[in-house]
Amino acid sequence: MSIIELKNVDVDFPQKKGKLVKAVNSVSLSIEKGDIYGIVGFSGAGKSTLVRTINLLQKPSAGDIEVDGTQFVKDGKQVISNKELQLKRRNIGMIFQGFNLLNETTVLENVAFALKHEKLSDDELEKKSLELLELVDLKEKANFYPSELSGGQKQRVAIARALANNPDILISDEATSALDPQNTQQILDLLKRLNKQFNLTVILITHEMDAVKKIATKVAVMEHGQVIEKGSLRQVFLHPKQELTKKFVGGSLEAISTLNSLHLDKLSKNESIYQLVYSVNNVAKSIIIELYKEIGVEVSMLYGNVELLNDEPIGTLVVLIKGDQEKQKQAKEFLQKQDVTLTRLDEKGNIYD
């Protein structure tokens, strides 16, 4: 069941001389309840602009928006009253890269601030705020000030505050971008736990594919305001169609670094380099040994890695295949039958044109 439906959403920003910049261009997404939906792309791709249309912090120029069964926008026009919109926004929590904490108040007071519209006694307010801090494993820091916390702890406070109204949706807008790897992992683990514990729908906006790989169930890739690819995380990771997606998912930076360090000579017509991406669970035997046995080509491994894709082990190999054109064709066909995704690379690790 979809909790968020975006259909043909545009966001136009007027410029001088009557020109328009199309920050979001005809985007359609269906996000189901309980998804961890990653939206990934480089800076300026339109990710943040798009997700801010969900709660109408950014008004769309065209399209339809429906959230949890309520129509917010129809044909680019707001159809929900401002009063009802204010109530509906309480069901959508948001966290940001910059934390947005009140520096002059304690951690407990920061969380309590999000409950100011509730008719709670002081004791009830404190109890509720402490419960939220306990949820993010930060109850012991209740009387600390933000300046006394690490970046990861500040983000935990922001998450506790975002959960104050028991939302069904949490939007994470580059929330881990300013954190070190350890704190990033802890925040991602927390988001995943909250997703499972409360069936919380999480929308993860990031330019870091690693964050999406670790916890997302579905992913959309954005470029120049458009969604160029979308699907389940496994589908997009194992079978990317667009070049940008291949760059995001392939561990290509490590592969490029490795190939550059090898200083390979220019490849002959009987030599090809391929990046192979596959599910370790589905490919039980050694791919290289099987290629040699079945096809008779010579295969050299140049790079190898195994990582977890939302708890599923995924292997990445970069191999040099030597053989005549017919043998190379047979090798490609054999690998594709094994559900291995192939991307041809040049000797420097770039995607082969």
UniProtKB/Swiss-Prot annotation:
Occurrences of domain ABC transporter (ranges): 6-249
One Gene Ontology term of the molecular function aspect: ATP hydrolysis activity
Presence of the UniProt keyword Transport in the record: yes
Binding site for ATP: 41-48
Range of residues in the leader sequence: none
SUPFAM superfamilies according to UniProt: ACT-like, P-loop containing nucleoside triphosphate hydrolases
Protein name: Methionine import ATP-binding protein MetN
